[in-house]
Amino acid sequence: MKDLLRTEHLSRADVDLLLDTAADFASKPLRSNTALSNKTVAIYMTKPSTRTRLASETAVAHLGGTPIFIRGDDLQLGRGETIADTAKIISGFCDALIIRTFKQSDVDELGAQSSIPVINGLTDDDHPTQLLADWVTIRENFGKDIKGRKFVYLGDGNNMTHAWLIMGAIMGAHVVAATPDGKWAPDAAIVAKAKAIAAKSGATIEVTTDAEAAAKGASVLYTDVWMSMGDPEAERAEKMKALAPYAVTENLMKLTEKDSIFMHCLPAHRGEEVEASVIDGPKSVIWREAYHRRTTIQALLYHLTRGELKGN
């Protein structure tokens, strides 16, 4: 597999390899590694970022490479140059590309037209690098045996929900998405895809509107911001009202297992999708989760540039 364009492209063997490598990088954070020595990685972002940019640049540096950060308005794409032409130019100068943008189709085309590995750092439809960081964190807390555990996402049925369901299906997990019906529910096609993967992996995929039922007995409660970049501001009041029952509160956390954890991909809006007492409380693992953005991107670059991921 040359690229990581979508979460669904990963096999279970790929994920296990990446998580093991990320855990190794985390245990030896200052170990010298020259996998990207004399190599350059382009980091192209049309969406502002804190974690993805920092994680990507430090991941490249930890592997001995040189990162080049490119803003959306730095390229000629905005003036009519094609994605195909841009992909060929970047491929000629760089050894890998990490992209964070809006349209999944742009990432897919960049992957198809590039001769170098392309990594999806986030789109409106998917967020594979975040899910790898999430699962390293889950394994640190619960180990590799997840039998009998339930992993629950609450809130907007967005790109994180999609990636959460797909990765959970790949991992053979019991995953739940608790979201409103209608326009803020996860894409039905993605849910169907997750269930198809689950039929082979033994996973259990649930989508519900009942936040309390979802939280009961959960090992993980996970959420994301309610207003993502690009969401229409005119819908804010309506969306906030629809999502209010899915806020992660102390009362909701009381329904979970004794050893449960709270996760959030960040940035967070305390008082909206999560209470401050939860995200800043003893069950929150958000800082370690954010740290693993670097270790997992580092693992991706290490294995993709060596041609060691097989895909599904």
Q: Which residue stretches match the model-derived regions?
A:
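Positively charged, low-complexity intrinsically disordered leader regions
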Residues: M1-L54, T58, D126
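Active-site cofactor/substrate anionic-group-binding motifs, chiefly glycine-
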Residues: T40-V41, M45-F93
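Glycine-rich phosphate/diphosphate-binding loop of Rossmann-like nucleotide-binding domains
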Residues: T46-T58, F142-T223, D231
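Short, structured coil segments at secondary-structure junctions
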Residues: L63, F93, Q113-S115, M171, ...
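Anion-binding alpha/beta catalytic cores of soluble intermediary-metabolism enzymes, centered on
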Residues: D95-M167, H264
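Rossmann-like adenosine-cofactor binding region
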Residues: K195-S277
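Adenosine-phosphate binding glycine-rich loop
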Residues: D259-S260, C265-N312
